[in-house]
């Protein structure tokens, strides 16, 4: 069983993979040029890793929660993914990733976003 986690932002999509609910790792982030390009790159990951579950971060709370959730759900609909999709609270995931000090915050290469996806994927499966 393989699960792909997505931290969907307007400029970057953080990506992480979990295998057999036991081993998780961040993958290379997707730099968004447009919605369709980003969706196609996510589809490549889904096919390459034979993914059967998606865990998608959505921010809970705050004034933009409804708008962001709608954007995230619309993006997921572009994937034509017919297997399980779970939406999880991604609040503070980027902040928690920053606190690990493992990424250069000046670079906008998506490593922070993939680390955030990795963290909420680990939490989803209760991994340490």
Swiss-Prot record:
It comes from the Bacteria. It is found in: Cytoplasm. GO terms for biological process: rRNA 5'-end processing. SUPFAM superfamilies: Ribonuclease H-like (SSF53098). Pfam families: RuvX. GO terms for molecular function: nuclease activity. Its main location: cytoplasm. Keywords: Cytoplasm, Hydrolase, Nuclease, Ribosome biogenesis. GO terms for cellular component: cytosol. InterPro entries: RNaseH-like_sf, YqgF, YqgF/RNaseH-like_dom, YqgF/RNaseH-like_dom_sf. Its EC number is 3.1.-.-. NCBIfam families: PRK00109.2-2, RNAse_H_YqgF. Belongs to the YqgF nuclease family. Could be a nuclease involved in processing of the 5'-end of pre-16S rRNA. This is Putative pre-16S rRNA nuclease. It comes from Campylobacter lari (strain RM2100 / D67 / ATCC BAA-1060).
